[in-house]
Amino acid sequence: MNQVRLAADSSCDLLTLSGMDFVSVPLTIRTETEEFRDDAALDVDGMVRALRDTNGRSYSACPNVADWEGAFGGCGDVIAFTITSGLSGSYGVACAAKESCEERDPSRRIQVFDSLSAGPEIALLIEKAAAELRAGTNFDTVCNVLKSYQSQTHLLFALESMHNLAQNGRVSKLAATVAGVLGIRVVGQASAEGTLEMLGKCRGARRTLECLLRAMERLGYRGGRVRIGHCQNEVLAQDFCSELLHLFPQADIKSYPLRGLCSYYAERGGIMLGFEA
């Protein structure tokens, strides 16, 4: 297996990767009075509760150059992944760290991917990179494979609450309040430009699953891998897994709790799903 390090900011929801040299670089969620570092020590449920009670501004902060340089280490090749540059400065900072590391050691090769996404879609990209490296694929070919593969993956999400999005100015507070009062779930996707794109609104778990399935079909899903991350909503995530497996019995589908950064955006009850088209 090629000895290439994989690194990603914590929007990937992974802390370790079995059998691989993998480093997670924490983002931070901040309010006017508290700070939550998205690392292994974070109490995600506690953070979600605290943010629900926050009426002031909240926002996410990306890793700094030193954080990324530490993740890249002092030698060797690295493939790194960041949350979409449409939501965070993590990609730009990682690129600055790459340039600094390569200036110190011109023999190094560091490839940074702007995922144009978050969470489960990044997990798919990392899994693909790991599979290629385990198979002995060389560095340049792995990077080319990932560039092609990225065009075949997508991210959808369904949100029960938009409180945090309103608190950091990404949606209007009126829209967030109305959706909450009416019990409306918002379904959306990561656009081709890496921004949040709303696709529709629905009420109830059944309608939410139907809306997500229709969106997957429109984007070309035919039974490929699916990764479902949830924020305190294991029931909906498992129901969606069951629905997909009923339609596509051979599909590779996994669900798991989101970590800090993605829980900040998905909020309580929200789910995010990455899939192959």
Located regions from the model:
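Generic enzyme active-site microenvironment
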Residues: 7
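Ligand-binding "clamshell"
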Residues: 105-111
